[in-house]
């Protein structure tokens, strides 16, 4: 079939329109890749040297100061729990302002040259009241926490959806600095309900968090706490055991100790907890020299006073 000049012009225009529509509808470029034993971020292999930092426990006016200090001590990443009961104190009423403005905390971290690892729970532990669960859940009769109880999951979904509205625009794939998101928290030390874990995993994805997901557990709890589609990471595991445990689930890693404990917390009225610096310094040096990514829990000290 012979085409005249006008037909060719129309086809060229149609091709341009189709190409534009395809590019505008395509998903954001994947900026974080996990594989070959490493985290690849924006095309570069990165060893995560991270520190845990809790925005509600630092006065708002000191956020930037603490983030600057984190960068100055050689960290390239901060890890942050999100505390559900800090944002939804009444059912369906969310607060992300002032001290609760976690989006500002994350943007400030980006301005200071830091990646962020987000740990939204819904359960977080963190030596925080009710593990981060809102107290109004206690009024719900016959509600089973940390389970696939449909009512419980509906509350989790409402919280995670709202969190997605606030924070999913800040993933690195969307131009921000959130590089990974954690599914639940040390669930393997509590139960082994894979359907529950999968439900939380899917909620996080559906909320718009388009970066790699991970779980964290002690070495003996990974089997119970791991869920398909998430990188298994470790808490309080050192030396060659890091490789042995992770390789059972993701051969070749990458290897990430999501909670490395250089010290421990004090409890009011009890003897001060102290750790000689030599042993954790030796453990940290070993991990860094063997390419293991690590997050120090904690990187900033706090006093948490109970009501």
PLM regions: where:
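Substrate-binding/catalytic cleft of secreted carbohydrate-active enzymes
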Residues: 118, 122-155, 163-298
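Bacterial N-terminal signal peptides that target proteins for export
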Residues: 2-12
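Conserved, mostly hydrophobic/aromatic
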Residues: 43, 78, 109, 181, ...
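A general structural detector for well-ordered alpha-helical segments in enzyme core domains, enriched
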Residues: 66-69, 98-105, 159, 163, ...
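Conserved small/polar residues in nucleotide/adenosyl-binding loops
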Residues: 303-307
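Bacterial N-terminal signal peptides
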Residues: 12-21
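N-terminal carbohydrate-binding accessory modules
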Residues: 25-77
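Aromatic-lined substrate-binding rim segments of carbohydrate-active enzymes
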Residues: 64-72, 79-128, 205
